[in-house]
Amino acid sequence: MMTNLLLDITSATIDWSRAQFALTAIYHWLFVPLTLGLAVIMGIAETCYYRNNKPFWKHVTRFWQKLFGVNFAMGVATGIILEFEFGTNWSNYSWFVGDVFGAPLAIEGILAFFMESTFVAVMFFGWDKVSRGFHLASTWLTGLGATISAWWILVANAWMQYPVGQEFNPDTMRFEMTSFMDVALSPFAINKFTHTVTSSWIIGATFVVAVSCWYLLKKRETQLAKASIKMGAGVGLIATLLAAMTGDSSAYQVAQVQPMKLAAMEALYNGGNGESLTAIAAVHPFQQPDYENEQEPAMRIAIPNMLSFLATRTADGYVPGVNDIIKGYTHEDGTREPSVQEKIARGKKAIVALKTYRETKAKDQLPILRENMKYFGYGYIKDAKELVPSIPICFYAFRLMVGVGSLLILFFALSLFLVYKKEIAQYRWFLISAIIMIPLAYIASESGWIVAEIGRQPWTIQDLLPVSAAISDIEAGSVATTFFIFLALFTTMLAVEISILVKQIKKGPEYE
């Protein structure tokens, strides 16, 4: 299997495989955050029912559980396909790091998924069959299981962005885990988990508030709608504030371990001390800018020193730009970051040493391999420009995420004010705006993932394995065919989900 890492794969195969994985991931992420968010709302509603034993809260809980169930099933279906793609389209990746990457996914499948499967059955079919306390526990444990599932998947993703706790074994040609705790509890994983889960709560909260506002527009289910707005807006406001805090921590981590991603997010071509944070700028949306010759984007409006503060926690800290990273630069602590050409040379040394050791078992190659293994992936890079991700996509996706996220803070705060201090049903403009917030919240969430994944290109595993070496040696035509099959399948699934959700929302809660 390892020999495939040394073959040339056509660019068409790489592009179609990337497109297929992106398609599956984007569709999967339409379902997952709503599942995580609705789980919190269900838990709060049923806790109210458990405490006061009022049938009203039971109806509220069961109504949101019904919508949760539809979405949960779709999320499971798309998630299974996503995991299979690692073996079909990315077999070299699976072979190279399967011992490390597979561990969190195995735990997710054995622990979290079975936990969800067990308690979701009790949650749906255990009403009036088990005690109220056990049913409440089942509802919360269903949400906890989904959250634990997200934890292990995000641990795996974080490891790809910041690989720690592993060592390369030249005899097996694979990375092997040396510290499970380093992988599971890396700062990158913790930040990614907290930011992703809080953003999921935001989507669930937005959905609940929007559906409730639709009822108020139709002058239906007024009591349920107002109670749900209080829950949803409360959860949403807390979640947006937490997402802002965890987003700041995530950006700091990116600055430390993925400086090229940060440079692309900011369209920062030439770095320096006391760098400003770009609020808006004119970056061509459809072509890579001439970062080698341009000083900065046109029509740039920026906040002085803010980027340095976010990236280094000091107002005059040094932040490298795209050109600095390519040419090499000096860190604040005085250590030197090699140029891309130096890294490529060292990466090629590592590959040659590995091939020689594999063919001859010459032990004198092992010190050379160990010395240069840090830059192993650079040995596959032909041109420094390959290391610069799409600046327009990263730049605008990041601003979409932050802009809509800021709008959501105001939205939830206004929701709470109107539902507690005013007669919210009288503000028709707000009720309509709430419905519009559903696609905006999804755009913000998907934009965050686009920044995270596009921003680390060309790496499958940061610095260790580029996309071009992680791919399976398969025909581009077969991948293209399955791409369109999946596109049709996922679009149909999404249409079915929306249709069922709309039907159930129009039907409303079922009163006993």
What does each of the following model-derived ranges do?
Residues 2-512:
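Polytopic transmembrane helical bundles with strong interfacial aromatic enrichment
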